[in-house]
Amino acid sequence: MQHNSLIARFARGNLVIQILVGIILGISLALVSPSSAESVGMLGSLFVGALKAIAPILVFILVAASIANQKKNQHTHMRPIIVMYLAGTFFAALTAVVLSFMFPTTLTLVTGAEGANPPQGIMEVIKTLLFKLVDNPVNALMSANYIGILAWGVGLGLALHHASDTTKAVFEDLSHSVSHIVRFIIRLAPFGIFGLVASTFATTGFDALAGYAHLLVVLLSAMAIIALIVNPAMVYVKTKQNPYPLVFQCLRESGVTAFFTRSSAANIPVNMALCEKLKLDEDTYSVSIPLGATINMAGAAITITTLTLAAVHTMGIEVDLMTALLLSVVAAVSACGASGVAGGSLLLIPLACGLFGISNDIAMQVVAVGFIIGVIQDSAETALNSSTDVVFTAAVCESEAQKAKG
């Protein structure tokens, strides 16, 4: 009986506080016993694995069900959300350019990224994305190709739009069932994050990052400006309301888990649950959240821009204003295609370096620096990318609700 009441108390507890306790315990264990901390890393791997396993099915079923059950004259407001996604990514690249000029970073270049295979140009990134769009649906689900999953989910949903009510009800019930599984997995987040934090501190330590402190400060400052100034400003323009309660809730409930899982895909179920909690329109968020995990890449744009300009400053290359603006556009477009590149934003750095005539050898050394600081850079980038998906979706839903009220 005591055992059951303990589980019930845990299930009813505040998830954010439980996650914070997990973080503190993880750091403590890493300091006291690094070997034990590495062992509990399996808890983190299991948690991330469970999220990654459920996410493709969740997206496919939710998108198909929401489109199949969509009533006539019901709008999903995707256009303003996509505009906010793209504008936010461009502003992120622009912010990184400004900070990189104000506080120029030079790098001590290292080797170690020779095995990586960056795309040869923007057309290759676009080509990869187009082929992901027409991927086999089973393969898309198996390989977590969200562009393909979205395409097939939308296609099936449109086809089922004319199906019988019984068939539509089956998909609706399936979406509720998958959502229940997601809620159960998210309740286990404190254990997963405890394992992730403990193993990260035990295996990485932070001595390796000390030499790149200046670069990290510029990167994290740009991300903080986007999260705490630019995004709230965009939300205010859209809703004419105080944006900070929404922004802080999204950072707390989406950003924290994204920071430790370091995976936008794994955070899709967390974001879906948060949208449900915020009582947003399911037809809208079931499409906008997985789409955001694919194209809303403010953090990636900052990483590409900052590391490229660090390479430029290291090589002593002069950059004029127009080239810097062009870099912002290239970084924003490349970042939107980051999901089409194995290795994500870091492997798009050589593409941006090509603007300045920097050789591939040097560019790959900059990528290696990115891998060294990745434990912080990738975590912060994912937290910004993923929490922004909910911020912008909620802003548009609120704005459209205001218009409907007149």
UniProtKB/Swiss-Prot annotation:
This is Serine/threonine transporter SstT. SUPFAM superfamilies: Proton glutamate symport protein (SSF118215). GO terms for molecular function: neutral L-amino acid:sodium symporter activity. Gene3D superfamilies: Sodium:dicarboxylate symporter. GO terms for biological process: serine transport; threonine transport. Signal peptide: none annotated. It comes from Vibrio vulnificus (strain YJ016). Belongs to the dicarboxylate/amino acid:cation symporter (DAACS) (TC 2.A.23) family. NCBIfam families: PRK13628.1. Pfam families: SDF.
